[in-house]
């Protein structure tokens, strides 16, 4: 899916999964996305059902995604997030 949005173009290359559901039909998704025909990046953000509208999110390069995975891989998230 390649969609122009103003000056912004995006293509969801692969949906890796949904990590949360909103109350208005939006879902927080982890996707591999190409922005403006550039190299694909890992993307975490809210999307509406048709992927025509999006919320603010986080986009990570391959190096950043690997560093993030390493950072949280050893955490006990239940303990860390209970603070």
Q: Where is each model-derived feature located?
A:
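Positively charged, low-complexity terminal tracts
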Residues: 1-83
């Amino acid at each position: 899916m390649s969609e122009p949005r103003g000056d912004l173009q995006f293509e969801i290359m692969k949906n890796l999964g949904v990590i949360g559901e909103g109350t208005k039909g939006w879902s927080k998704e982890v996707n591999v996305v190409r922005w403006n025909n550039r190299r694909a990046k890992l993307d975490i953000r809210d999307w509406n059902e048709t992927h025509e509208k999006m919320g603010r999110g986080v986009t990570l390069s391959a190096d950043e995604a690997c560093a993030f995975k390493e950072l949280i891989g050893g955490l006990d998230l239940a303990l860390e997030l209970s603070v």
